[in-house]
Structure formats: C-alpha cells, structure tokens
Amino acid sequence: MYPAHLLVLLAVCVSLLGAASIPARPLNLYQFGNMIQCANHGRRPTWHYMDYGCYCGKGGSGTPVDELDRCCQIHDDCYGEAEKLPACNYMMSGPYYNTYSYECNEGELTCKDNNDECKAFICNCDRTAAICFARTPYNDANWNIDTKTRC
C-alpha cells in the first residue's frame, strides 16, 4: 500500500473515532420547537425556553419558579413516563429520539392517528407542553437563572 493511501486511511479512522464520541442530538427537539412556534404563533423564539427556570432545558430539579417552569416540569415528567412504556424501550425509540406525525393548523396542534403507541405518547407530551407555554406568561427574570441557588 502506498504511504498516501495509509494517510487517507488513518485520517478516515481518526474522523470516525471523533464522530463516535459526539453525542447524538435528540431528533424530536426540532419537532417540539415547531410545535411551540405553532402554539404561540411565533411570538417568542423557541430558544427562549431552553434555559428558563429550573426545568426548561436539560435536566431539572427543585421547585419550579413559576407557571411556565411548571409546564416544563410536567413535560419532563411526561417524558419520564414515556420512557417506562414498553413501546418506548427500544434503542432510539424513546422520547428524545423518536419522531412523530402531527399537524399545525392556525395554532391548533393535532397528533395524527398514524403514530404508534410510543410516538403518540411523546407527541401528546410535546403538544400539551407547547399549549401550556403559549397560555403562560414569560418572565424575562427567570431566563438563565442560577439554578444552584434558585432551584
């Protein structure tokens, strides 16, 4: 084998090893973001909900700081229940990686009937949270808080 071929092979191997260490990005977060935009008619960017209070975003603990944060706590709990379903126990079928079918029609969200049990459950978790976000006031003071002292 030529030295150039070995270098190419080495580069490919290193790239694959690097890619294997990158955590998979949840697939349904994009759908959940679209549901939020549908329910609130695009009034607030989705990223505003990613670091709000004690529960909106990754993880969650303590007492929710307000009603919007409570929406996120309920959503987290709903995903926890989804993970317990036998239909959601397969690799890449849980709430963070499973995509579902839904419709948005003038702010009305509908989970479609063609979803299997796991997808239907996850879709309803996201739908309920998106509707909760849309009807609940947003307090700028609760965005990007110090969760170690406030939660």
Curated annotation (Swiss-Prot):
Protein localization: Secreted
Predominant cellular place of this UniProt entry's protein: secreted
EC number: 3.1.1.4
Range of residues in the leader sequence: 1-27
Tissues expressing the protein: Expressed by the venom gland.
Binding site for Ca(2+): 55, 57, 59, 76
Keyword list, A-Z: Calcium, Disulfide bond, Hydrolase, Lipid degradation, Lipid metabolism, Metal-binding, Secreted, Signal, Toxin
Keyword Transport part of the UniProt annotation: no
Matching InterPro entries: PLipase_A2, PLipase_A2_Asp_AS, PLipase_A2_dom, PLipase_A2_dom_sf, PLipase_A2_His_AS
Cofactor note: Binds 1 Ca(2+) ion.
Required co-factors: Ca(2+)
Any one GO biological process: positive regulation of fibroblast proliferation
Enzyme class label: hydrolase
Active site location: 75, 126
S-S bridge residues: 38-104, 54-151, 56-72, 71-132, 78-125, 88-118, 111-123
Task of the protein: PLA2 catalyzes the calcium-dependent hydrolysis of the 2-acyl groups in 3-sn-phosphoglycerides.
Similarity remark: Belongs to the phospholipase A2 family. Group I subfamily. D49 sub-subfamily.
Name by which UniProt lists this protein: Acidic phospholipase A2 6
Organism: Tropidechis carinatus (Australian rough-scaled snake)
